[in-house]
Amino acid sequence: MLYGMIGRPTHCLLLRDENVRSTRLIPNFMVVLCALILTGAVGGENPRASAPPMRVVGYLASWGVNTKGTSIANLPAKHLTHVFYAFAEIAPDGSVTLGNRCVDVGACGKSASLPRVAGGNFHELRRLKARYPHLRLTISVGGWAGSARFSDAALTDASRRKFAGSAIDLFIRRWPALFDGIDIDWEFPVEGGLKGNVERPEDKQNFTLLLAELRRELDAQGKRDNRHYELTIAASARPAEIANLEVDRITPLLDFINVMTYDYHTGGSIAHFNAPLYAAPHDPTPEMTIDSTMRVFRNANVPAEKLLVGIPFFSRAYGGVANVNGGFLQAAPTPPKNWHDSDGDWRRLSVTRLRDPHYKRYWEATARVPWLYDASTGNWISYDDPESVRAKMDYVRGQGFGGVVIWELGGDDGQLMRAIAGEN
């Protein structure tokens, strides 16, 4: 946006839009005047820096490629700014390694060495980047099932150096110009992760130190390569787990934060929403909403443009739910016996339960999310559809957040991504 005492002159906007090609069409005095306005030399407020473009980050689960109808060549790259490849793992010695050597780079068999020219998914991702030069590719380390060794990796100066150095050696130096950054998905420091994860009270401080080491090494490599490498994290949406981050100290180290604003009621005993935008009337947990989560980060002085709101392309289901109020907030003793991940994403849901006459669609106007309920079985499903995604996008734009992050790209048939892009 351009601001000054003479408003927004059409010629200045033309100069900016058409760049140097237009200058020969504009009188010299107008070029000078535009330059003065753009530099703040003409009276009025100083010009405000334009906001960065909205980021649209999509996680790509390695195990879903070519198994769920997802191919890398057909990813909706024109609508994405970033693809986050999930996941790299932490080896027993604390170094970062591939999650699946065969799938990731085509190094199949126990004796296969890592190729200098990557095959597998990495090869396909390089081809995708060549077709879409704007697209940035990030390797994500950890995840829900891969966070057991983070606490040990972050524990000492030596372990942090080993973690950071090995990540950069493998994903930045070995295959140049493939990855543009590193994402840390530690679920979760201190407590709250998968049973069996190593957890320590000092994880809170050590996570900051681990990110600082990564930032230092990425910047050093970026200086050698004459470019910037991004560092991001995936952060919990739950207030208790956000409290286990030194938010004020990690924010300056990060390019942005992917807030996992979903799974709010996983493991709960009542039928509740996976990713409500706001609290529904009579909601006993009003703090478990997207808006409440984002307020926690904003109240910690995280710039809005560094925060990305999570949008799930998957559903959560409950079973044995009583037929009262369409099942919402009713006791949910068991999950549906036939429920599993591949059947619960939007891609499958849109052609199964949504077409099943036993399921009725409901809409909660305050929370801005739908649900499905089968009164004959008591099965209750919370999910996102194009209508709720559009509501989330309106919220993101209205609050000035930096964009959205999707888990995960293989769960869509195109409808949800078009809603994100404003095409439906």
Model-inferred region functions:
Residues 48-172, 202, 331, 338-341, ...:
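Glycan-recognition patch characteristic of GH18 chitinases/ENGases
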Residues 37-51:
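Bacterial Sec-dependent signal peptides at the C-terminal "C-region" and cleavage site
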Residues 83, 139, 184, 214, ...:
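Conserved, mostly hydrophobic/aromatic
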Residues 357-424:
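Extracellular low-complexity, Gly/Ser/Thr-rich intrinsically disordered linkers
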Residues 122-126, 164-168, 204-215, 290-295, ...:
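Generic structural signal for well-ordered alpha-helices
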Residues 57-58, 93-117, 189-349:
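Substrate-binding surface in catalytic domains of secreted glycosidases
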Residues 156-182, 213, 242-253:
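An active-site-proximal structural segment forming one wall of the substrate-binding cleft
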Residues 28-40:
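Bacterial N-terminal signal peptides
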